[in-house]
Regions:
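Transmembrane alpha-helices and adjacent helix-loop boundaries
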Residues: 168-169, 202
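Short, surface-exposed loop/turn segments at secondary-structure junctions
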Residues: 161-167
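Catalytic cores of eukaryotic secretory-pathway lumenal/extracellular enzymes that build
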Residues: 1-161, 179, 185-189, 193-268
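Acidic, glycine-rich loop-and-strand cores that form catalytic or ligand-binding grooves
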Residues: 175
Length: 268
């Protein structure tokens, strides 16, 4: 992912007057035009959160701000909400991990099936990024067609409606010309949290601040409401039949409305 995926949602957020937003869309360290972390030391999502909070305070939001994220950004947003008093509320559209054992409702079963498909058939890239980071980085940095194949297939299989070829090429070209794909997968090396499991299931990162969640049917890991509620102070949960992993790109107006409604409800 990159900031390109968030550009379509910005006009909807900026146009909101109740509430009104200052929208900050930072690139994570090492992504596209953002400076990389040092290669001689580990750099985790906890470090990313620390730098993002430092950025927000430096921009004048030391009295409080809202954090929002999907995919890796959702991990960073959770860490921010759990560890930094400057973060007043958190909205997510991804919450990877397995929650407590529950009996799924009929409405939840398609999402569980989708989750099973992803974990059984489409999860191999995570293991490659995590355990063979340098190997896959060398391969994808050596050939733009290889990078297109690796990234492009995710756009196709993780979206509700496939993005246009131009949209896919824009993202892949950005990775290629900035030569940043290898360092962008650094976070996978420290994929688990301190408790040995997914960030979102870490009891030490349970969110006491208000949590909002947007669930999209074609997300790679759709999350039942009760699972999300087990990870924090859930005050707003919305399920959408249309939309997938790249919600800000696919259905920006829908996600923007969820964010605005949540902020209006939870911000104090």
């Amino acid at each position: 992912g990159s900031f390109l995926e968030f550009l379509p949602i910005i006009p909807y957020l900026v146009a909101s007057t109740s509430p009104a937003f200052h929208v900050i869309v930072p690139s994570l360290p090492g992504y596209t035009f953002s400076s990389p972390p040092s290669v001689d030391k580990d750099f985790s999502r906890y470090d990313v959160a620390r730098l993002i909070n430092k950025l927000m305070v430096g921009l004048g939001f030391g009295n409080g701000y809202a954090a929002q994220g999907g995919d890796i950004g959702s991990d960073v947003a959770r860490i921010l909400g759990a560890r930094y008093d400057t973060v007043k509320i958190v909205h997510l559209n991804f919450c990877g991990g397995k929650g407590p054992d529950i009996e799924f409702t009929e409405a939840e079963k398609p999402g569980v099936k989708r989750m099973g498909w992803f974990l059984n058939e489409d999860y191999a890239y995570v293991l490659e990024h995590r355990h063979r980071s340098s190997t896959i980085s060398i391969v994808l940095a050596s050939n733009p067609v290889a990078l297109l194949a690796w990234v492009g297939e995710k756009f196709l299989s993780w979206s509700d409606v496939s993005p246009s070829l131009d949209t896919i090429l824009e993202s892949v070209t950005l990775w290629w010309v900035t030569e940043t794909f290898p360092r962008s997968i650094y976070p996978y090396r420290k994929l688990d949290s301190s408790h040995g499991g997914p960030i979102h299931m870490d009891p030490n990162l349970h969110l006491n601040v208000p949590l909002g969640f947007s669930n999209f049917a074609k997300e790679i890991i759709p999350m039942p409401e009760r699972w999300v509620a087990s990870t924090g102070n859930l005050v707003l949960y919305r399920h959408h039949e249309h939309g997938g992993h790249f919600a800000a790109l696919e259905v920006p107006e829908v996600l923007a409305k969820d964010i605005a409604d949540f902020v209006k409800l939870a911000w104090r």
